[in-house]
Amino acid sequence: MSEYKSVQKGSLKLKGVSLPSKKKKKKNKEMKRLEEQVLTSENEEGTKKAYVDKRTPAQMAFDKIQEKRQMERILKKASKTHKRRVEDFNRHLDTLTEHYDIPKVSWTK
């Protein structure tokens, strides 16, 4: 047991490496200053002009038509139920030649 009495307890101390110093806590002055900066920047942003649209008239017309066509596609797809879509698909398969023959799709499964 006397062999273990001289054992050094604690963390290892490496040469050339200083002990890590505790970080200083930030004072409330800095936090208050930062909050004031944020508030003043928000006020400045509110006084700035609104977003200016830099698109050409042709680009605006193109986007408007794109939105209109997309809405038409959505309404067209939403108007049919799944059952109706399956029936239309089966009717389309019936019109094809036997080269493309695949079994009919069941809407119940």
From Swiss-Prot:
Enumerate composition-biased segments (Basic residues).
21-30
Primary subcellular site in the record, as a coarse category: nucleus
Q: Its Gene Ontology biological processes?
A: apoptotic process
Location comes to: Nucleus
List, as start-end ranges, the regions of compositional bias called Low complexity: 9-20
* Record keywords: Apoptosis, Cell cycle, Nucleus
Spell out the residue ranges making up region: Disordered: 1-48
Gene Ontology CC terms, in alphabetical order: nucleolus
Q: Which domain of life is it from?
A: Eukaryota
Q: Which residues span the membrane?
A: none
InterPro entries, per the entry: FAM32A
Family to which the UniProt record says this protein belongs: Belongs to the FAM32 family.
Relate the protein's function as given in its record.
May induce G2 arrest and apoptosis. May also increase cell sensitivity to apoptotic stimuli.
- Protein name per its UniProtKB record: Protein FAM32A-like
Q: Gene of origin?
A: fam32al
